[in-house]
């Protein structure tokens, strides 16, 4: 099993907020909670928040969790290279389950392949001499700020390998889940039971008022709010978060431009199809007129036949 190599300055799982700083009562957040760098920093800095989020995502009780350990920590505040640096989080749950978490706000149209890559990479961890049954269950969870399948919107969806005919589960060791932060309105009763809708609202929050409201009766959200404030007060971490915001704005512009071009191409194709249909109709009309003319001429000049 991977060793516990979480970074320094991480709050313990038993952390409470009684001795921490007071967060602002109002005003806009310096960095939105959907920022993937802030998301990683929050879960790396505060183990209690990580545990609470996993409880909600896996529909578990806190007492069911003995340990959650991040196995790929980063040095918070260091600059990152978009070509080689990814912000997904690998977690070992109860020394048994491998969980991969990632926040993504820009639809790069690659999430299906990306999530499968994470899933396969984490599952392929057998060492020489180990038996296949020794493999640990792997769960890949994406928190997306867009709808993965617009034709089938769902707030929280889970995918596994099934027999396509009778839906027999092939294995319970591989699973992909997606939390659509943009469709909290579709949360089910079970989602609300485990407060997944509140977690989504936490990550979608834009103001301190929203965080204050969520944190009133929930220690996880109180811890999250205070840790986010603490993180964004640290210059190097804040600068990395803001750099990610600049990157995301650039990518969002590219995404919007791509969508606009895609719409324009579809519109031009539709116009071309209409023009082709009109041309076909004209050709048929001309052929009909030519046939009528030939018939008329044959009647007017029967000797020509």
Where are these regions (language model features)?
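Generic recognition of short, well-ordered alpha-helical interface segments
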Residues: 45, 49, 191-194, 219-223, ...
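Short hinge/gating elements
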Residues: 35-42, 181-185, 210-211
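A short, charged helix-loop
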Residues: 152, 157-190, 194-198, 205-206
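Short helix-to-loop capping/linker segments positioned immediately adjacent to catalytic or ligand/cofactor-binding
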Residues: 126-131, 167, 185-188, 210-214
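Accessory alpha/beta interaction modules
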Residues: 1-175
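Amphipathic alpha-helical transducer elements in NTP-driven molecular machines
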Residues: 112, 138, 193-196, 218
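Short, charged alpha-helical interaction segments and adjacent helix-coil junctions
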Residues: 2-27, 99-104, 201-305
